[in-house]
């Protein structure tokens, strides 16, 4: 029988504050002028906010609902005591924004080198300071367990700590926050576009048009899969520890490194070659690292080490360069329009494709097409 709590968690990732279904992958921004209203805006939670300092409250919530998770950033103006509980089979990762004050979870301080983690159906208490911002990710439990087994090739319980506070290296926390900010910035820019000047509105309209085009081409699922894979990888990296006490069972520490390095040179080259061939065979979509791990039956850490050893770069970096070079060759032979070539190589955001292409080759795709 299907787990009803998993279904509830999955449904909650795609509903807004009013309970209405929203398009997965489309950012949503809400503003509250009451602490209880702010608490209600977070769908999929049981929670109560008590305002502990005088003054008019203002809270904002920027969220990105996805198929298997919800990513959000919450900002609150006043000191709050929050009684919280995520519903269903899901896990909440709470990463405070640096420089905005420390919060407490169940009376324990969460400092700059740590983040909070709580499973669903477990009540906890947060005490947050004034002018506070926090990134949150709520992920379905079945998704985390599948990722641990199929991509990390590790036991989920060994990878994800059970304590409410998880220590992590500053580099890993900064990388995770930068990733979440990059995804949520789209929401902020779209809101500014709706309320800003003509150029802002035109920019927002272009982004929405690109999204609509992606949906018509059936690529939105691939885009969401890429985002979710990036977030999952960053979360598991952060859970690996602060570098001193990383858990070998989740690929961290000296023992984990030794297992990965035991792969022979020929085996590493074979893994890289197989990854390249698989990406080229599925060039019309952006194949991610998790998919490669499942296809090649290797862990993400092993794949990372093989690419670093053979090519001197991360797998995602090389695979993007591989697709960009393929697009460059097609443009130089006038194999189609810029949009056609981009789509043929799995680039569905034209503006991002143009920026990546120019960064790689020093010219825009349209310039390469005209010069051919």
Task: Give the label of every model feature segment.
Residues 2-56, 103-283, 288-290, 294-300, ...:
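Alpha-helical bundle regulatory/interaction domains
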Residues 48-84:
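Long amphipathic N-terminal alpha/beta scaffold segment
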Residues 67-69, 76-104, 141:
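Glycine- and acidic-residue-biased ligand/ion/polar-headgroup-sensing regions
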Residues 86, 268, 320:
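Short, conserved glycine- and acidic-residue-centered signature motifs
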Residues 303-307, 352-353, 357:
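Short hydrophobic/aromatic patch on the recognition helix
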Residues 309-310, 321, 359-360:
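Alpha-helical DNA-recognition elements
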Residues 317:
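Short, basic-rich loop-to-helix N-cap that marks the start of a DNA-contacting helix
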């Amino acid at each position: 029988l299907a787990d009803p709590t998993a279904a509830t968690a999955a449904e909650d990732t795609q509903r807004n504050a009013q309970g209405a279904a929203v398009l997965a992958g489309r950012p949503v921004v809400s503003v509250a002028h009451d602490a209880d209203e702010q608490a209600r805006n977070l769908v999929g939670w049981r929670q109560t906010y008590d305002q502990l300092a005088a003054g008019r409250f203002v809270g904002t919530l920027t969220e990105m609902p996805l198929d298997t998770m919800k990513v959000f950033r919450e900002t609150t103006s006043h000191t709050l005591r929050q009684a919280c509980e995520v519903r269903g089979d899901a896990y909440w990762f709470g990463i405070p924004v640096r420089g905005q004050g420390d919060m407490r979870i169940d009376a324990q301080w969460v400092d700059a080198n740590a983040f909070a983690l709580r499973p669903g159906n477990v009540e906890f208490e947060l005490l947050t300071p004034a002018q506070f911002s926090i990134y949150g990710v709520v992920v379905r439990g079945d998704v985390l367990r599948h990722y641990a087994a199929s991509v990390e090739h590790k036991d989920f319980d060994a990878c994800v700590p059970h304590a409410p506070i998880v220590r992590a290296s500053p580099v890993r926390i900064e990388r995770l926050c930068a990733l979440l900010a990059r995804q949520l910035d789209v929401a902020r820019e779209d809101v500014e576009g709706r309320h800003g000047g003509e150029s802002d509105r035109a920019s927002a309209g272009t982004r929405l048009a690109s999204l609509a085009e992606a949906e018509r081409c059936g690529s939105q699922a691939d885009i969401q899969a890429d985002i979710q894979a990036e977030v999952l990888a960053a979360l598991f990296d952060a859970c690996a520890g602060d570098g001193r006490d990383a858990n070998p069972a989740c690929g961290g520490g000296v023992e984990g490194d030794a297992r990965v390095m035991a792969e022979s040179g020929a085996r590493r080259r074979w893994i890289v070659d197989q990854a390249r061939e698989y990406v080229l065979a599925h060039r019309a979509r952006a194949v991610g690292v998790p998919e490669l791990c499942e296809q090649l039956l290797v862990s993400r850490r092993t794949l990372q080490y093989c690419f670093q050893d053979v090519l001197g770069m991360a797998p995602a970096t090389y695979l993007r360069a591989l697709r960009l070079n393929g697009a460059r060759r097609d443009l130089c032979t006038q194999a189609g329009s810029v949009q056609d070539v981009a789509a043929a190589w799995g680039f569905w955001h034209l503006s991002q494709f143009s920026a990546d292409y120019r960064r790689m080759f020093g010219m825009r795709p349209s310039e390469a097409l005209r010069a051919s």
